[in-house]
Amino acid sequence: MKASMFLALAGLVLLFVVGYASESEEKEFPRELLSKIFALDDFKGEERGCKGFGDSCTPGKNECCPNYACSSKHKWCKVYLGK
């Protein structure tokens, strides 16, 4: 019973996201949706002077915020795990 309720709720959420995506014509839809859901606007790199998760960066320069490192392979800031 709990599993069917969870699946029904997950289906409704998925239907909402797909419906919203089909109406949206902006190219930055995924980031916009995450911004609205998790209020990521407070964490944009322009406001804090350093680059956050997923922002493009140049390896060797210390552009990423603390706890993030510039990936030399992908050239974007990712979580630094200390390895």
Swiss-Prot record:
Signal peptide: 1-21
Positions carrying Leucine amide: 81
Pfam family membership, one: Toxin_12
Annotated function: Selective antagonist of neuronal tetrodotoxin (TTX)-sensitive voltage-gated sodium channels (IC(50)=1270 nM on Nav1.1/SCN1A, 270 nM on Nav1.2/SCN2A, 491 nM on Nav1.3/SCN3A and 232 nM on Nav1.7/SCN9A). This toxin suppress Nav1.7 current amplitude without significantly altering the activation, inactivation, and repriming kinetics. Short extreme depolarizations partially activate the toxin-bound channel, indicating voltage-dependent inhibition of this toxin. This toxin increases the deactivation of the Nav1.7 current after extreme depolarizations.
Record organism: Cyriopagopus hainanus
Propeptide segments, given as residue ranges: 22-48
Taxonomic lineage from the root: Eukaryota, Metazoa, Ecdysozoa, Arthropoda, Chelicerata
This protein's name: Hainantoxin-III
SUPFAM superfamilies: omega toxin-like
One Gene Ontology CC term in the entry: host cell presynaptic membrane
